[in-house]
Structures are given as structure tokens and as C-alpha cells.
A protein has these predicted regions:
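C-terminal scaffold of the Radical SAM
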Residues: 1-296
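Short, amphipathic alpha-helical interaction segments positioned at domain boundaries
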Residues: 328-343
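A short, conserved structural fragment
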Residues: 309-321
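An alpha-helix initiation/capping motif
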Residues: 187, 298-299, 328-331
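Minor-groove-contacting beta-hairpin "wing" of winged helix-turn-helix DNA-binding domains
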Residues: 321-327
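Short amphipathic alpha-helical interaction segments
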Residues: 298-312
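Auxiliary N-terminal substrate/complex-recognition segments of SAM-dependent methyltransferases
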Residues: 282, 302-303, 335
């Protein structure tokens, strides 16, 4: 916590030296793993440090990710007192063998305890799910969705499992010990999630995110998808301000050493030109419910729009109104849509 607060102080100095006005934070998101493994007092101190440095806008959304095993009423109350308004609980699955495949150690029974603790502290609740783990069936996924809905969260995220190079799971797949994720099964799981959640009153607002209404959407994540500015703190954190993107060194020791010496923890940076910013707008904004303006598609790629409508990937009516908006089929093939529309 002390090192992260040192970076917060460093960022204030950077803005002052650049003659830039400090803006109140409209959203804060504490994630990147399992922050609730930290003592709640340290988490609270970090949030208070950010608030003191920048201020929080009225009605600011302040989210903390949480492992279900670490959330007690006392923890939730302490976080709420520090200004947290929302808790994103890493449920992942309700099925023990799926959790084992994902190498998650929490007890599914603790989801109810964590949700009750968060609600008791007045926090909004989001549940995070992952689908497509080795050995997970469509029936397993249905069980996880039903269990998640039984907790009546304000918001729900469902992400397809991505196999990261260098992980234990990647090595097991390479050796043939476990099967690779099945694309067709993952598509069936996504469609099941969308149908099940819609029937329970949840509306999709981003490819992998659903909420009970507009007020329950994650404003912080929407800021990412809309290409707005953010400042990320911590080892490996990425930031984006006024067309400049930079990222911190990943190793915690190197990160701490740089800040102790009064140096920037940034490992690299790049200025995004108009072409790159246009591509990124298409990549990110096409994922959200309102879509992206068709003006971001270059003139030589506009001809692809008709084909995407014919293939049922984007909404024809929205295209006439000047928007690229994904259909359900388009959400399943979002990357292909972006490839078709980028130079």
C-alpha cells in the first residue's frame, strides 16, 4: 500500500509539472488479482490516498474486486467506510470440478456469505463468471448461471476462458493431459448465458457484461470501452491520458525500487496517432450496446458493412442510422467483425 501511494504522489507531481489540472476521479477500480487478500485497513488507506490526491466526484463509483473467501461483514463495512460503493466478487463457477480446473480455491458456499456481507454494508454487487474450462459441460454452466441468479446480483460478467501462455493449464493442454477449450461449446455457453440472463431481467451492455438496468452498469469499465482517460497504479498497470499510453514495469521489486528513487515506474510509452486511435475506437466501442459510429470505419472498408449485415453480424437498422451495433451472432464473432472493418 505504501508503494502504491508513493506512485499516486508521483502522478500528482507529473500533472503539476505538465501544467495539467487535476480532475476529480469519477470512478476507481481496485483489481488486478485479489485485492481483498490485503488487510482491509491497507485497502482503505489506498483509497483514502487517491481521494486526498484527486478528490472523488459526487456519486463516484468505487469498486473493489474480491475473493469470496475473504469477504466478511467486518471487511465489507470497513471498505464501505473508506468510500467503496461496489464489490465485484470472483464467483467463477458454482461447480467444484470446474473451480479445480480453473485453479480457484474458494468454497462455492462462501458466495452467499460474501454477497450478504457486501449487501449488509450497502454495496452494489457484481458476480464474475468464467465459462469454457476443461471438463465443463453445458449443464455445469447452467448450474453456475442459476446459482449466480439466485443471489440476485446487480451486475454479472461472464468471460470465456482464455489460455494464457506459460500457465499450468497451457502446459497441460500442450501435453494432451486436458482438452483445449471447444469454440462451439463456448459459443453455446455464451448463448445460454444471454438467454438465461435476459429472461431474469438482465440486459447486455457489453459483450461480456449484463446488468439489471443502466444504473447498475460498470461505469469504470465503460470508460475503458469508450476510450476515456484513466491512470493505472501498481506493477504492470496500464494508463491512457490524452492519446498517450504507458505501462509500468511488471516486477513488484523493480516497481518499488524506481519509486523509492523518485523515478517513474513506467516501462514504456507510446503516442497514439489518429489511425491507431480510430482502430482502437472500433475495437472497443463496437463491443458495447450502443456500438460505434460508422464514421470510424475508413472509406475503403465501408463496403464490408453490407456483407456483415447480410451475414447477420451487425444490425441493419442501426447501420442505416450510422452505427455499427453487434447482433447476438455478431457478439460471438466480434473479433471477426473488427477484422472486416479495419485496414
Amino acid at each position: 500500500a505504501d508503494t502504491l501511494l508513493r506512485e499516486v504522489e508521483f502522478s500528482v507531481g507529473v500533472l503539476e509539472r505538465a501544467g495539467l489540472r487535476r480532475r476529480e476521479a469519477s470512478t476507481v477500480f481496485v483489481g488486478g488479482g485479489t485485492p481483498t487478500l490485503l488487510p482491509p485497513g491497507d485497502l482503505a488507506r489506498m483509497l483514502i490516498g487517491v481521494r486526498d490526491a484527486f478528490g472523488l466526484a459526487p456519486g463516484a463509483e468505487v469498486t473493489v474486486e474480491a475473493n469470496p473467501d475473504t469477504v466478511t461483514p467486518a471487511v465489507a463495512q470497513e471498505l464501505a467506510a473508506a468510500g467503496v460503493t461496489r464489490m465485484s466478487i470472483g464467483m467463477q463457477s458454482a461447480v467444484p470440478h470446474v473451480l479445480a480446473a480453473l485453479e480457484r480455491t474458494h468454497d462455492p458456499a462462501n458466495i452467499a456469505t460474501a454477497v450478504a456481507a457486501a449487501r449488509g454494508a450497502g454495496l452494489a454487487v457484481s458476480l464474475d463468471l468464467i465459462y469454457g474450462a476443461p471438463g465443463e459441460s453445458l449443464a455445469d454452466w447452467q448450474s453456475s448461471l442459476e446459482m449466480a441468479l439466485a443471489h440476485e446480483p446487480d451486475h454479472l460478467s461472464a468471460y470465456a476462458l482464455i489460455i494464457e501462455d506459460g500457465t499450468k493449464l497451457a502446459r497441460q493442454i500442450r501435453r494432451g493431459e486436458v482438452p483445449a477449450p471447444d469454440d462451439d461449446l463456448q459459443a453455446d455457453m455464451y448463448e445460454l448465458a444471454d438467454t438465461t440472463l435476459a429472461a431474469s431481467g438482465y440486459e447486455w451492455y457489453e459483450v461480456s457484461n449484463w446488468s439489471r438496468g443502466e444504473a447498475q452498469r460498470s461505469r469504470h469499465n465503460l470508460a475503458y470501452w469508450r476510450g476515456q482517460d484513466w491512470w493505472g497504479y501498481g506493477p504492470g498497470a496500464h494508463s491512457h491520458m490524452a492519446g498517450l499510453r504507458w505501462w509500468n514495469v511488471k516486477h513488484p521489486a523493480a516497481y518499488a525500487q524506481r519509486l523509492a528513487l523518485g523515478e517513474s515506474p513506467a516501462a514504456g510509452r507510446e503516442r497514439l496517432d489518429d489511425d491507431v486511435r480510430g482502430i482502437e475506437r472500433l475495437l472497443l466501442e463496437s463491443r458495447i450496446r450502443e456500438g460505434v459510429g460508422i464514421d470510424v470505419v475508413t472509406s475503403e472498408k465501408r463496403s464490408a458493412v453490407a456483407g456483415l449485415i447480410a451475414d447477420g453480424l451487425i444490425d441493419g437498422g442501426e447501420a442505416i442510422r450510422g452505427r455499427v451495433v453487434l447482433t447476438l451472432r455478431g457478439r460471438l464473432l466480434a473479433d471477426a467483425v473488427v477484422r472486416a472493418l479495419t485496414p
